[in-house]
Structures are given as C-alpha cells and as structure tokens.
Amino acid sequence: MSTESMIRDVELAEEPLPKKAGGPPGSRRCFCLSLFSFLLVAGATTLFCLLHFGVIGPQREELPNGLQLISPLAQTVKSSSRTPSDKPVAHVVANPEAEGQLQWLSRRANALLANGVELTDNQLIVPSDGLYLIYSQVLFKGQGCPSTHVLLTHTISRFAVSYQTKVNLLSAIKSPCQRETPEGTEAKPWYEPIYLGGVFQLEKGDRLSAEINLPNYLDFAESGQVYFGIIAL
C-alpha cells in the first residue's frame, strides 16, 4: 500500500460520523397529547374520589349551642308523635264501694273514656268498626278454704249489633282451694288474680262487659288491681 493511500485512510477515519436525523415532528406532538390526556384523566379521577369520600367539598354548617341538623323525615316523625291520637280508648276501674257487685267507673283517677267510647249500663260501647285490644284484670282474696269447692270465674263478653247475641270472648276459671281448711288450724289468706286480653274485630255499637261470678271475693285493698279497657289498633 502506498504512503498516500495510508494518509487518505487516516484522514477519513478522523472525520466525524454524520448525525442521525431526528424523528418527525408529528411523533413528538402525539406524545405530548398522550401525556396531557393521561394527566387530565388522572386528575379528574382523583378529584372525583376526594369528593365521593368527603375529603373535600361543602362542610356541614355548625349550629350554635350544640344543636344538630334534623332531616325532614325526622321532623315529620317528631311532629306526628306529638299529635294527639284520635283512636277510641277506654280504661275503667272497679268501684270499691259497690258491695256484692262489680261496678265499673270512668270518673276516677287513672280512668278514662276517649274518642267516642261510652260506659253505659256497666258496658263499654264501641264507637267505630275496627280491631280492638280488649283487656281486664280482677283480684280475688279469701281467708281459708270452706267445705264447698270455690271456683272463681272472670269473663269478657260481647253483645254484637249484627246478631244480637251475647258471646263470651275471653274467659278463665281458677280454684284457690285444693282442700278444706281443717278445724282448729289457722285460716291463711289466699290471693288469685285473673288477667284476660285479646285482639278482636268489633263493630260500631257493640257492647262489651267484664263480669265475675263471686264479687264478694274481690280485693279492693289497693287501686289498680281491678280494671277493664279497650284500645283501638
């Protein structure tokens, strides 16, 4: 190889290589748009999550003196609970001064007749059709057991306007004495309460009565022991 050829090769090797031409301008623009779209979607998603979970957003107004906001539903329930009930109701008590009979009174403490219920001839008069809770309690008391068997009965009856017949709705029988008190032994007192209660469909004008068979055994020592009532449901 000649000297001139070697010199030419060295000069060619020292020349810098040509730079690669850059990518087209359109590819850079697409990359920028993609990056911007990603950031926009990510930001919107983050904002939605923060609003959804209550991290940011309108804050509840604090009321003075520790008062709390009440929803319209709660206000409706609260106001309706204060509205006086227009359903028929009655609660009568026994007259402790009536000897030998069970007489009901409505003008005594803890007794009432409301919204159309009447007490006539010792019976409660139903003012309107519907379901009613009927209840009654009596308390019997005795001293010792006689030779004859003692059976105590308590009955709630209905005289319906539709068939003009007296029908027993509720009834119970109890026997306080299992055997006669032997002669010469101390006669111990006994007590027998009877409670009756049930729900019935009644008609306007029906008459309800609560009766017993042996009123002489009734105990009137304390108030609230003998009563009779109805409540419209």
Curated annotation (Swiss-Prot):
Phosphoserine: modified positions: 2
Side Cytoplasmic, residues: 1-35
Region described as Disordered: 1-25
Record has tRNA processing as a keyword: no
TM region(s), chain numbering: 36-56
Subcellular location: Cell membrane
Annotated site, Cleavage, chain positions: 34-35, 39-40, 49-52, 76-77
Extracellular side, ranges: 57-233
Residue span(s) of domain THD: 88-233
A Pfam family this chain is assigned to: TNF
Membrane topology note: Single-pass type II membrane protein
Glycosylation sites recorded in the entry for this protein: 80
Family membership: Belongs to the tumor necrosis factor family.
Its biological purpose: Cytokine that binds to TNFRSF1A/TNFR1 and TNFRSF1B/TNFBR. It is mainly secreted by macrophages and can induce cell death of certain tumor cell lines. It is potent pyrogen causing fever by direct action or by stimulation of interleukin-1 secretion and is implicated in the induction of cachexia, Under certain conditions it can stimulate cell proliferation and induce cell differentiation. Induces insulin resistance in adipocytes via inhibition of insulin-induced IRS1 tyrosine phosphorylation and insulin-induced glucose uptake.
Subunit structure: Homotrimer. Interacts with SPPL2B.
Protein name in UniProt: Tumor necrosis factor
Highest classification ranks of the organism: Eukaryota, Metazoa, Chordata, Craniata, Vertebrata
Name of the gene this protein is made from: TNF
